[in-house]
């Protein structure tokens, strides 16, 4: 059973501790700091609220700000406004499942309170499982238990922390993505395809994950070229690639089609409560009962592309304005981290990168012992994935979302810092000399759990190397600052 694994047990314990501290701090910050009056989506509350609802709002209201309001609104009312379709249905559906489990309390709690409780509890669960999934993935890819352990612990202190706790889809997406990657590394291709498809139903950038499947299948094809029937192998490759692309793209396509039926087909509109209609009038939100929007007449009517362009001004270099310099500075640490990771890997394995990870050496007859850890040949496809996300995010998106965008999508953001810590922190080697401590008295005889080396470094902060201070300083600063600002409607999105 996986909980009996010592390192995974410590990862799970640390994840639980970090989640509890996160929830406590967001409640504290939300209580003592007045909310900033931001120009954000803020729909009216239709149901009356009692004392218990006010208590839930006071304890968990910090999790409902910025984009979280969209997810909560969609879970409660469905996709009423055109711009709601920027948010994929996977997470709202998960919240609805959570509220069904709270149905016995509906006489005491409003639907919104049930949704807030679902946000806190489900993201708590998703985060813990994602940390364990990242640890397991690291063991499979890095072949270095220490780096896998460090990376999973760093994930618990992620700079994207507040978005992994609040009513955002990042925690669920990270769980599905890391789990899908792990299944693919185990050779369970179609389980991986299914998990990647679910991830695409949670966030649109799940579509990029098709690259993992294509690379894995191409590796299998080239390794079988010496077989007697290469044409048959080529046909199998093409069929497998088609099925992978089709399966991963299906959730996205179905979601776009659903939007088309709501806004572009006559008679598909459903009744909307009058206060929400008035909100649409006041704010200029488009609802299905009005004139057909322009995207309905496109050759390929994609509401998602239209919304990103018209509502959020997302596009190539559109965000490159002088007034956005603070947001570029906010995104700079994660951009530097991923760019540094990419450069380190490419300069270490130039031939591997030139051959797209399909050939490790110019001379196939002399196979050197492969590197372990972050520099392992298996990491190539993950580095490419991270670099593509960074390039797209940096050129086409609101750059301030890069931290949560990368922090929930790529293990490179945690593997590379773990590599730097192991490579450049002498204190870790001294900590390894006493790496175990006994479990509680009720544990099996001889069972031990590893010390938490990240906490050990924090305890010995003054003697840590500069690289360690930079890494942990960045992680902890964003971990805490994100809670402080985001939970009070201050600009941390």
UniProtKB/Swiss-Prot annotation:
Residues 1-13, 99-113, 158-161, 214-234, 349-378, 491-493 are cytoplasmic. GO terms for cellular component: endoplasmic reticulum membrane; mannosyltransferase complex. Residues 35-77, 135-136, 183-192, 256-327, 400-469 are lumenal. It comes from the Eukaryota. Keywords: Disease variant, Endoplasmic reticulum, Glycosyltransferase, GPI-anchor biosynthesis, Intellectual disability, Membrane, Transferase, Transmembrane, Transmembrane helix. Not N-glycosylated. It is an enzyme of class 2 (transferase). GO terms for biological process: GPI anchor biosynthetic process. GO terms for molecular function: alpha-1,6-mannosyltransferase activity; glycolipid mannosyltransferase activity; mannosyltransferase activity. Its main location: endoplasmic reticulum. Alpha-1,6-mannosyltransferase that catalyzes the transfer of the second mannose, via an alpha-1,6 bond, from a dolichol-phosphate-mannose (Dol-P-Man) to the alpha-D-Man-(1->4)-alpha-D-GlcN-(1->6)-(1-radyl,2-acyl-sn-glycero-3-phospho)-2-acyl-inositol (also termed H2) intermediate to generate an alpha-D-Man-(1->6)-alpha-D-Man-(1->4)-alpha-D-GlcN-(1->6)-(1-radyl,2-acyl-sn-glycero-3-phospho)-2-acyl-inositol (also termed H3) and participates in the seventh step of the glycosylphosphatidylinositol-anchor biosynthesis. This is GPI alpha-1,6-mannosyltransferase 2. The gene is PIGV.
